[in-house]
Amino acid sequence: MLLAELAEVSRAVAATPARLEKIARLAEALRRLAPDERAVGASWLAGDLPGGRIGIGGATVRAALDAAPAEGGGPGLTVAEVDAALGRIATASGAGSAGARRRELDALLARAGAPERWFLAALLLGELRQGALEGVLADAVARAAGLPAAEVRRAAMLAGALPPVAVAALSEGAAGLARFRLRVGEPVSPMLAQTAADVEEALRALGGEAALEWKLDGARIQAHRDGGEVRVFSRSLRDVTAAVPEVVALLRAAPEPRLVLDGEAIALRADGTPEPFQVTMRRFGRRLDVERLAPDLPLTAFFFDALVAGGAELLASPERVRWAALERAVPAEQRVPRLVTRDPAEAGAFLEDALARGQEGVVAKALDAPYEAGRRGAAWLKVKRAHTLDLVVLAAEWGSGRRRGWLSNLHLGARDPSTGGFVMLGKTFKGMTDAMLAWQTERLKALATGPLDAWQVPVRPELVVEVAFDGIQSSPRYPGGLALRFARVKRYREDKRPEDADTIETVRGLYGG
């Protein structure tokens, strides 16, 4: 298949709000992919690169786009050719590797037309927002293969990713899907939580009574034990066993020889409060001297679910049954603090205690719900205290997919009184309605200080925006050394001037506090 065909499918999917039309277009594209293109094609249609990041940053992509010839030339790029080129970019290493990656990218863009360039750039930047979420794509795989959507979703849940399931479904049908099952030692995608505004809303949504557990500000882990063999996986399903000897020791000491447990690993201070998230994440670097780091930065594991315990797979079991199995598998000090209640006042006090002890908040869980691996289901609801800052828009990037034609991704900065300038803290495209996107595009075009046909448009720092975020982390990417976690736009503050924006000292105070 030509890349241009896939780019056109992406454009069409982004352009329609109709779920059934999205599914139909994606299913047709999946059917047309050659067998050796199905895995990569399914990944790209989901907006992902099969191997994750490939060593090219946003600045390089934008510079390559700006330098590309006005019109692409040569024969049309195929999916296989592009996949091979991206593979060469990902594996380039050593002296001169940055130049080699750039030359490969330049060669791709030189052969690509405008739609293909936008598709490639959005894919490389992780910004292919076309409304083809995994649920939509799973339904498209089911339609393309003539299989029940529930079976495709279950296989994807157990595989931890949809592309291998797409390959199996399209190549082997139901027999291919039957191979996907929970195996101790092989990770499954973790269950995720939706958001509730407060504990009262969470209790109402869950039918009155629910289990509340502390939401720890740590690293999600999935721990597997099969006899003497222990493996630990991250939220992204990466094997991190070597990085967490403390967790390995806990599993080996457990009374049950066969376990799959879901939980968090966290670095704690002497007073029991958590270190900042970024400090915990130092234990999970890819180049890590664990023997040197572990004594100074030990990890503590807290578990909150059992997927395999007592000789049984528990995915379909109610939450209360899985918790009882967890109680038998690990001692109380290795489980998250928990409260079962229907009393909003009691739930509120539990939340305040978690926050006072430095945790993110609580997760409310339906007692009779199964474990929905890989889904952000309504059976788990997180309640956190969000922070807000008034920041200034420093630049914006043109959107892709259904946001094409709008300035979407905002560069956000805090005021620096010492220089009179602004310090960038991150970017966000989240929280914006279509009306807000249309309004801000016109305002930012009027404030532009650079060409409007560039990928990124710098603007005069005049617009103040109220931004909600979940925390602050250290980041070498930005000049102030700090970045916002999960930032999203709440509203523009037209009543405020840039000099009324929050200062970098305020941000540093929040980080230190």
Swiss-Prot record:
<keyword id="KW-0132">Cell division</keyword>
<comment type="function">
    <text>DNA ligase that seals nicks in double-stranded DNA during DNA replication, DNA recombination and DNA repair.</text>
</comment>
<keyword id="KW-0067">ATP-binding</keyword>
<comment type="similarity">
    <text>Belongs to the ATP-dependent DNA ligase family.</text>
</comment>
<feature type="binding site">
    <location>
        <position position="235"/>
    </location>
    <ligand>
        <name>ATP</name>
    </ligand>
</feature>
<feature type="binding site">
    <location>
        <position position="376"/>
    </location>
    <ligand>
        <name>ATP</name>
    </ligand>
</feature>
<dbReference type="GO" id="GO:0003910">
    <property type="term" value="F:DNA ligase (ATP) activity"/>
</dbReference>
<dbReference type="InterPro" id="IPR012340">
    <property type="entry name" value="NA-bd_OB-fold"/>
</dbReference>
<dbReference type="InterPro" id="IPR012308">
    <property type="entry name" value="DNA_ligase_ATP-dep_N"/>
</dbReference>
<feature type="binding site">
    <location>
        <position position="304"/>
    </location>
    <ligand>
        <name>ATP</name>
    </ligand>
</feature>
<keyword id="KW-0233">DNA recombination</keyword>
<keyword id="KW-0227">DNA damage</keyword>
<keyword id="KW-0460">Magnesium</keyword>
<dbReference type="GO" id="GO:0051301">
    <property type="term" value="P:cell division"/>
</dbReference>
<dbReference type="InterPro" id="IPR000977">
    <property type="entry name" value="DNA_ligase_ATP-dep"/>
</dbReference>
<dbReference type="InterPro" id="IPR012309">
    <property type="entry name" value="DNA_ligase_ATP-dep_C"/>
</dbReference>
<feature type="active site" description="N6-AMP-lysine intermediate">
    <location>
        <position position="215"/>
    </location>
</feature>
<dbReference type="Pfam" id="PF01068">
    <property type="entry name" value="DNA_ligase_A_M"/>
</dbReference>
<protein>
    <recommendedName>
        <fullName>Probable DNA ligase</fullName>
        <ecNumber>6.5.1.1</ecNumber>
    </recommendedName>
</protein>
<dbReference type="InterPro" id="IPR016059">
    <property type="entry name" value="DNA_ligase_ATP-dep_CS"/>
</dbReference>
<keyword id="KW-0235">DNA replication</keyword>
<keyword id="KW-0436">Ligase</keyword>
<dbReference type="GO" id="GO:0006281">
    <property type="term" value="P:DNA repair"/>
</dbReference>
<feature type="binding site">
    <location>
        <position position="264"/>
    </location>
    <ligand>
        <name>ATP</name>
    </ligand>
</feature>
<dbReference type="GO" id="GO:0046872">
    <property type="term" value="F:metal ion binding"/>
</dbReference>
<keyword id="KW-0479">Metal-binding</keyword>
<dbReference type="Pfam" id="PF04675">
    <property type="entry name" value="DNA_ligase_A_N"/>
</dbReference>
<keyword id="KW-0131">Cell cycle</keyword>
<feature type="binding site">
    <location>
        <position position="213"/>
    </location>
    <ligand>
        <name>ATP</name>
    </ligand>
</feature>
<feature type="binding site">
    <location>
        <position position="382"/>
    </location>
    <ligand>
        <name>ATP</name>
    </ligand>
</feature>
<dbReference type="InterPro" id="IPR050191">
    <property type="entry name" value="ATP-dep_DNA_ligase"/>
</dbReference>
<feature type="binding site">
    <location>
        <position position="220"/>
    </location>
    <ligand>
        <name>ATP</name>
    </ligand>
</feature>
<dbReference type="GO" id="GO:0006260">
    <property type="term" value="P:DNA replication"/>
</dbReference>
<dbReference type="GO" id="GO:0003677">
    <property type="term" value="F:DNA binding"/>
</dbReference>
<dbReference type="InterPro" id="IPR012310">
    <property type="entry name" value="DNA_ligase_ATP-dep_cent"/>
</dbReference>
<dbReference type="Pfam" id="PF04679">
    <property type="entry name" value="DNA_ligase_A_C"/>
</dbReference>
<keyword id="KW-0234">DNA repair</keyword>
<dbReference type="InterPro" id="IPR036599">
    <property type="entry name" value="DNA_ligase_N_sf"/>
</dbReference>
<dbReference type="GO" id="GO:0006310">
    <property type="term" value="P:DNA recombination"/>
</dbReference>
<dbReference type="InterPro" id="IPR022865">
    <property type="entry name" value="DNA_ligae_ATP-dep_bac/arc"/>
</dbReference>
<dbReference type="GO" id="GO:0071897">
    <property type="term" value="P:DNA biosynthetic process"/>
</dbReference>
<dbReference type="GO" id="GO:0005524">
    <property type="term" value="F:ATP binding"/>
</dbReference>
